[in-house]
Amino acid sequence: GIIDHLRSIEGVEAAVFFEELPENKVRVSARSKIPAIDVCKVCKQFQGGGHPMASGARVPGSLQQVKHDFLKALDHEIRNRN
């Protein structure tokens, strides 16, 4: 899918795809190319889950707010990776 295409781009270490759903929800799909970026850890902050390198969540809120909050959490994970 789209998320795998984004992840395949040279230099990309993590990719996120946001999809607006009905009833003010957003589906988030997150993928990582490297184990040091644990996207599952980020998704769990939004009541999601999955695997360290492939995870997702359905998050209540507007696309703009969910995108802002999720990318802020992912940025924190990337900056604090081991």
Features from the language model and the residues they span:
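Gly/His-enriched, cation/cofactor- and phosphate-binding structural elements
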Residues: G1-N82
